A protein has these predicted regions:
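Bacterial N-terminal signal peptides that target proteins for export
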Residues: 1-7
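Catalytic pocket-lining loop regions of alpha/beta-barrel enzymes
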Residues: 124-125, 139-230
Length: 230
């Protein structure tokens, strides 16, 4: 019996070693300050699991997960202050700096400040951009000045697709409409900016994964992440 166990362990060693060495790039992480922590997400998830108690605990738990699962890079988006806080704690140079925006004027943003933040390397990915929650789409005119800047500096764009949290329209995102989260609604952007790299967050969500796949097969500059697909 013991001999069989030893042989089994020996046979599994190469597999276990390979798994432990797998390097992961997480394309979809959110940062918070205490002022916006818990403003959108419920205290417990669908399965009853409780989240972090506050923004500081969330940061520590996420960095522990980075280490545990060998996440070597992570695209982190949130308000600019929160991303800076995460950078200050990032001794392993894991964080790729993003910015979470529902509307083009969030945080008092304008194109002058946005371009300067890119020049200062405070924004390395434009996203998560989530027009859906603000009642717009990435193809709307209000987003075009930002997209032109991103194409100019080769800044990837991460755009929300698929729906949001159940009941969100009745609470924190009254302008959100499910139809606005269809990946097909960004096709005009893909045509207008052929050099602009974009990835579809949530891969079209639970409603439009086929639309995401079809777009990616047609437009070579389009990618996806696979975060929270259901």
């Amino acid at each position: 019996m013991n001999k069989s166990i030893i042989i089994s362990v020996i046979l599994l060693l190469p597999f276990l070693f390979a798994q432990s060495q797998t390097k992961i790039i997480d394309m979809h992480i959110h940062s918070y300050t205490q002022s916006d922590f818990g403003g959108r997400e419920p205290a417990r998830d669908h399965y009853g699991n409780r989240g972090s108690a506050n923004a500081a605990a969330h940061l520590l738990a996420t960095f522990a997960a980075f280490k545990k699962w060998n996440i070597v890079k992570a695209v982190v988006s949130g308000n600019p202050e929160s991303v800076e806080n995460w950078m200050a704690k990032d001794s392993s140079n894991r964080v790729i700096k993003g910015i979470l925006m529902f509307s083009p004027d969030d945080y008092g943003m304008d194109t002058v400040r946005f371009e300067q933040m890119i020049k200062d390397k405070k924004i390395e990915v434009f996203g998560e951009v989530a027009p859906y929650y603000g009642g717009t789409t990435l193809s709307d005119s209000i987003w075009q000045p930002y997209l032109r800047i991103c194409e100019k500096y080769d800044i990837p764009v991460a755009v929300h697709t698929g729906g949001g949290d159940p009941g969100g329209t009745y609470t924190w995102s009254p302008k959100a409409r499910l139809r606005l989260a269809d990946p097909y609604l960004i096709e005009d952007v893909l045509v207008r900016y052929p050099k602009l790299r974009i990835y579809l967050m949530h891969a079209g969500g639970e409603d439009w994964p086929e639309h995401a796949i079809r777009l990616m097969s047609y437009y070579p500059q389009l990618y996806t992440d696979v975060a929270v697909m259901l």
